[in-house]
Protein backbone atom coordinates (compact mmCIF):
# COMPACT_ATOMS: atom_id res chain seq x y z
CA UNK A 1 0.00 0.00 0.00
CA UNK A 2 1.37 3.42 -0.98
CA UNK A 3 2.42 5.74 1.84
CA UNK A 4 0.86 8.81 0.24
CA UNK A 5 1.35 10.95 3.35
CA UNK A 6 5.13 10.73 3.09
CA UNK A 7 5.61 10.76 -0.68
CA UNK A 8 6.85 13.89 -2.47
CA UNK A 9 4.40 16.07 -4.42
CA UNK A 10 6.18 15.20 -7.67
CA UNK A 11 5.78 11.47 -6.96
CA UNK A 12 2.09 11.81 -6.15
CA UNK A 13 1.42 14.07 -9.15
CA UNK A 14 3.05 11.46 -11.39
CA UNK A 15 0.67 8.80 -10.06
CA UNK A 16 -2.29 11.15 -10.47
CA UNK A 17 -1.21 11.93 -14.04
CA UNK A 18 -1.26 8.20 -14.81
CA UNK A 19 -4.72 7.93 -13.19
CA UNK A 20 -3.35 5.63 -10.47
CA UNK A 21 -4.70 7.88 -7.70
CA UNK A 22 -8.30 9.01 -7.87
CA UNK A 23 -9.48 10.05 -4.42
CA UNK A 24 -9.53 13.15 -2.19
CA UNK A 25 -6.03 14.41 -1.44
CA UNK A 26 -6.39 15.39 2.23
CA UNK A 27 -3.49 13.89 4.16
CA UNK A 28 -1.30 13.33 1.07
CA UNK A 29 2.26 14.75 0.93
CA UNK A 30 2.14 15.80 4.56
CA UNK A 31 3.42 19.33 5.09
CA UNK A 32 3.02 20.48 1.47
CA UNK A 33 0.65 23.13 0.13
CA UNK A 34 -2.52 21.94 -1.58
CA UNK A 35 -4.45 24.21 -3.93
CA UNK A 36 -7.86 24.74 -5.46
CA UNK A 37 -7.95 25.11 -9.24
CA UNK A 38 -10.00 27.50 -11.37
CA UNK A 39 -9.59 27.76 -15.15
CA UNK A 40 -11.39 30.38 -17.24
CA UNK A 41 -11.02 31.81 -20.76
CA UNK A 42 -8.76 34.84 -21.16
CA UNK A 43 -11.74 37.15 -21.69
CA UNK A 44 -12.93 36.32 -18.14
CA UNK A 45 -9.51 36.08 -16.48
CA UNK A 46 -9.24 39.72 -15.36
CA UNK A 47 -12.71 39.65 -13.82
CA UNK A 48 -11.85 36.47 -11.94
CA UNK A 49 -8.51 37.91 -10.81
CA UNK A 50 -10.36 40.96 -9.50
CA UNK A 51 -12.97 38.73 -7.83
CA UNK A 52 -10.23 36.77 -6.05
CA UNK A 53 -8.49 39.99 -4.98
CA UNK A 54 -11.75 41.26 -3.49
CA UNK A 55 -12.46 37.96 -1.71
CA UNK A 56 -9.09 36.91 -0.24
CA UNK A 57 -10.55 34.75 2.54
CA UNK A 58 -12.22 32.36 0.11
CA UNK A 59 -9.99 32.87 -2.95
CA UNK A 60 -6.38 33.53 -1.88
CA UNK A 61 -4.25 33.45 -5.05
CA UNK A 62 -1.11 31.29 -5.03
CA UNK A 63 -0.31 31.19 -8.76
CA UNK A 64 -1.64 32.28 -12.15
CA UNK A 65 -0.48 30.74 -15.42
CA UNK A 66 0.28 32.45 -18.70
CA UNK A 67 -2.52 32.35 -21.27
CA UNK A 68 -2.64 28.90 -22.88
CA UNK A 69 -0.17 27.41 -20.40
CA UNK A 70 -1.03 24.65 -17.91
CA UNK A 71 2.27 24.93 -16.00
CA UNK A 72 2.06 26.58 -12.54
CA UNK A 73 5.63 27.86 -12.51
CA UNK A 74 5.57 29.29 -8.97
CA UNK A 75 3.91 26.37 -7.20
CA UNK A 76 5.18 23.37 -9.21
CA UNK A 77 7.56 24.04 -12.07
CA UNK A 78 7.16 21.39 -14.78
CA UNK A 79 3.77 20.18 -13.54
CA UNK A 80 0.73 20.01 -15.83
CA UNK A 81 -2.62 21.28 -14.57
CA UNK A 82 -4.35 19.38 -17.40
CA UNK A 83 -3.55 16.03 -15.78
CA UNK A 84 -2.05 16.46 -12.29
CA UNK A 85 -5.36 16.87 -10.41
CA UNK A 86 -7.25 13.65 -9.58
CA UNK A 87 -10.67 14.91 -10.71
CA UNK A 88 -11.94 18.00 -12.54
CA UNK A 89 -15.35 19.59 -13.02
CA UNK A 90 -16.48 21.29 -16.23
CA UNK A 91 -19.09 24.05 -15.84
CA UNK A 92 -20.74 25.56 -18.92
CA UNK A 93 -23.12 28.49 -18.39
CA UNK A 94 -23.48 27.49 -14.73
CA UNK A 95 -24.26 23.84 -15.38
CA UNK A 96 -21.97 21.00 -14.30
CA UNK A 97 -21.66 19.13 -17.60
CA UNK A 98 -18.81 16.69 -16.89
CA UNK A 99 -16.46 15.35 -14.25
CA UNK A 100 -13.22 14.00 -15.73
CA UNK A 101 -9.74 12.86 -14.67
CA UNK A 102 -7.92 14.59 -17.56
CA UNK A 103 -8.47 17.90 -19.37
CA UNK A 104 -6.76 17.10 -22.67
CA UNK A 105 -10.06 16.96 -24.57
CA UNK A 106 -11.25 20.24 -23.02
CA UNK A 107 -8.07 22.30 -23.27
CA UNK A 108 -8.08 25.54 -25.26
CA UNK A 109 -5.25 27.92 -26.05
CA UNK A 110 -7.11 30.87 -24.51
CA UNK A 111 -7.38 29.37 -21.01
CA UNK A 112 -5.84 30.84 -17.85
CA UNK A 113 -5.34 28.75 -14.70
CA UNK A 114 -5.56 30.04 -11.13
CA UNK A 115 -4.32 28.16 -8.07
CA UNK A 116 -6.04 29.22 -4.85
CA UNK A 117 -5.05 28.36 -1.29
CA UNK A 118 -6.74 25.34 0.32
CA UNK A 119 -7.43 24.64 3.99
CA UNK A 120 -5.92 21.16 3.62
CA UNK A 121 -2.64 23.09 3.82
CA UNK A 122 -3.14 24.05 7.47
CA UNK A 123 -4.29 20.62 8.61
CA UNK A 124 -0.71 19.55 9.33
CA UNK A 125 -0.45 22.51 11.70
CA UNK A 126 -3.69 21.44 13.38
CA UNK A 127 -2.48 17.87 13.79
CA UNK A 128 0.87 19.08 15.11
CA UNK A 129 -1.07 21.08 17.71
CA UNK A 130 -2.95 17.89 18.73
CA UNK A 131 -6.21 19.13 17.21
CA UNK A 132 -8.19 16.25 15.67
CA UNK A 133 -9.19 16.50 12.00
CA UNK A 134 -12.29 14.33 11.65
CA UNK A 135 -12.33 13.76 7.90
CA UNK A 136 -8.73 12.52 8.03
CA UNK A 137 -9.50 10.29 11.02
CA UNK A 138 -12.55 8.81 9.28
CA UNK A 139 -10.99 8.78 5.77
CA UNK A 140 -13.63 10.79 3.94
CA UNK A 141 -13.87 14.11 2.12
CA UNK A 142 -14.21 17.33 4.11
CA UNK A 143 -17.81 18.67 4.31
CA UNK A 144 -18.44 21.95 2.46
CA UNK A 145 -21.54 24.16 2.50
CA UNK A 146 -22.94 27.06 0.47
CA UNK A 147 -23.68 29.85 2.96
CA UNK A 148 -25.83 32.98 2.98
CA UNK A 149 -22.68 35.13 2.97
CA UNK A 150 -22.45 37.24 -0.18
CA UNK A 151 -19.07 37.57 -1.85
CA UNK A 152 -17.82 40.91 -3.13
CA UNK A 153 -18.74 40.90 -6.85
CA UNK A 154 -16.36 41.67 -9.70
CA UNK A 155 -17.41 41.94 -13.33
CA UNK A 156 -19.55 38.93 -14.19
CA UNK A 157 -18.70 37.03 -10.99
CA UNK A 158 -20.98 37.10 -7.94
CA UNK A 159 -22.63 34.72 -5.49
CA UNK A 160 -22.39 33.04 -2.09
CA UNK A 161 -19.33 31.99 -0.11
CA UNK A 162 -18.64 28.29 0.44
CA UNK A 163 -17.18 27.12 3.75
CA UNK A 164 -15.52 23.92 4.95
CA UNK A 165 -16.33 22.54 8.41
CA UNK A 166 -14.29 20.69 11.00
CA UNK A 167 -15.74 19.61 14.37
CA UNK A 168 -13.40 20.84 17.13
CA UNK A 169 -13.53 19.85 20.83
CA UNK A 170 -14.66 22.92 22.77
CA UNK A 171 -11.43 23.25 24.84
CA UNK A 172 -9.33 23.26 21.63
CA UNK A 173 -11.17 25.99 19.70
CA UNK A 174 -8.76 28.76 20.69
CA UNK A 175 -5.82 26.58 19.70
CA UNK A 176 -7.46 25.82 16.34
CA UNK A 177 -7.94 29.54 15.67
CA UNK A 178 -4.33 30.24 16.60
CA UNK A 179 -2.95 27.39 14.47
CA UNK A 180 -4.88 28.34 11.33
CA UNK A 181 -4.47 32.12 11.69
CA UNK A 182 -0.80 31.65 10.79
CA UNK A 183 -1.81 30.73 7.23
CA UNK A 184 -3.80 33.59 5.64
CA UNK A 185 -2.90 32.43 2.11
CA UNK A 186 -4.82 29.19 2.73
CA UNK A 187 -7.95 30.77 4.28
CA UNK A 188 -6.47 31.58 7.71
CA UNK A 189 -8.71 31.86 10.77
CA UNK A 190 -12.29 30.54 10.81
CA UNK A 191 -15.05 32.84 9.58
CA UNK A 192 -17.68 31.34 11.93
CA UNK A 193 -17.79 29.17 15.06
CA UNK A 194 -20.93 27.45 16.32
CA UNK A 195 -24.56 27.65 15.18
CA UNK A 196 -24.60 26.78 11.43
CA UNK A 197 -27.96 28.49 10.86
CA UNK A 198 -26.37 31.90 11.42
CA UNK A 199 -24.54 31.51 8.09
CA UNK A 200 -27.49 29.90 6.30
CA UNK A 201 -26.70 26.20 6.78
CA UNK A 202 -29.99 24.44 7.53
CA UNK A 203 -28.73 20.85 7.80
CA UNK A 204 -25.17 20.30 9.01
CA UNK A 205 -25.53 16.61 8.14
CA UNK A 206 -26.14 17.31 4.43
CA UNK A 207 -23.17 19.20 2.96
CA UNK A 208 -23.43 20.70 -0.53
CA UNK A 209 -20.01 19.24 -1.39
CA UNK A 210 -17.93 16.48 0.18
CA UNK A 211 -19.09 14.12 2.94
CA UNK A 212 -20.78 14.71 6.29
CA UNK A 213 -18.55 14.59 9.37
CA UNK A 214 -19.69 13.16 12.70
CA UNK A 215 -19.92 15.87 15.36
CA UNK A 216 -19.35 14.23 18.72
CA UNK A 217 -20.62 15.36 22.11
CA UNK A 218 -18.49 18.23 23.37
CA UNK A 219 -17.48 19.30 19.87
CA UNK A 220 -18.37 22.54 18.07
CA UNK A 221 -18.63 23.00 14.28
CA UNK A 222 -15.97 25.44 13.09
CA UNK A 223 -16.17 26.94 9.59
CA UNK A 224 -13.43 28.22 7.30
CA UNK A 225 -13.80 30.11 4.00
CA UNK A 226 -13.30 27.62 1.18
CA UNK A 227 -11.78 27.65 -2.29
CA UNK A 228 -14.82 25.79 -3.64
CA UNK A 229 -16.50 29.22 -3.57
CA UNK A 230 -15.78 29.71 -7.32
CA UNK A 231 -17.96 26.67 -8.06
CA UNK A 232 -20.85 28.35 -6.25
CA UNK A 233 -19.99 31.49 -8.22
CA UNK A 234 -20.05 29.52 -11.49
CA UNK A 235 -23.56 28.26 -10.74
CA UNK A 236 -24.76 31.80 -9.97
CA UNK A 237 -22.84 33.82 -12.56
CA UNK A 238 -23.12 31.26 -15.39
CA UNK A 239 -19.87 32.02 -17.29
CA UNK A 240 -19.49 30.37 -20.69
CA UNK A 241 -16.84 28.05 -19.24
CA UNK A 242 -15.24 27.43 -15.86
CA UNK A 243 -13.11 24.37 -15.14
CA UNK A 244 -12.30 23.53 -11.52
CA UNK A 245 -10.95 20.72 -9.40
CA UNK A 246 -13.60 18.41 -7.99
CA UNK A 247 -14.14 19.40 -4.32
CA UNK A 248 -11.52 17.69 -2.16
CA UNK A 249 -9.43 16.55 -5.14
CA UNK A 250 -6.70 19.16 -4.96
CA UNK A 251 -3.50 20.08 -6.78
CA UNK A 252 -0.47 19.29 -4.59
CA UNK A 253 2.25 21.95 -4.77
CA UNK A 254 6.01 21.72 -4.22
CA UNK A 255 6.39 24.40 -1.50
CA UNK A 256 5.65 23.48 2.11
CA UNK A 257 2.82 24.74 4.28
CA UNK A 258 5.31 26.50 6.54
CA UNK A 259 6.47 28.57 3.56
CA UNK A 260 3.11 30.37 3.82
CA UNK A 261 3.15 30.87 7.59
CA UNK A 262 3.22 34.47 8.80
CA UNK A 263 4.27 33.72 12.41
Curated annotation (Swiss-Prot):
In terms of InterPro entries, this protein maps to: D-Glu_cyclase (IPR009906), Putative_hydro-lyase (IPR038021), UPF0317 (IPR016938)
By what name is this protein known? Putative hydro-lyase Psyc_1103
Record key words, sorted:
Lyase
Task: Please list the GO terms describing molecular function.
Answer: lyase activity
One Pfam family named in its UniProt record: D-Glu_cyclase
Q: Which SUPFAM superfamilies match?
A: PSTPO5379-like
Question: Which Enzyme Commission number(s) are on file for it?
Answer: 4.2.1.-
Task: Name the enzyme's class.
Answer: lyase
What protein family is recorded? Belongs to the D-glutamate cyclase family.
Amino acid sequence: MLDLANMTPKEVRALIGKNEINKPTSGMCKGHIQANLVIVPKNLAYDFLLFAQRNPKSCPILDVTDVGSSEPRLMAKGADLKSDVPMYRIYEFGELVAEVSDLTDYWREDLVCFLLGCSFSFESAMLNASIPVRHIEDNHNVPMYITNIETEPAGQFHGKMVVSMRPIPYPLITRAVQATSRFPQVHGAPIHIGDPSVIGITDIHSPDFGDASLIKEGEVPVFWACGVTPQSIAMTSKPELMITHSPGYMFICDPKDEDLAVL
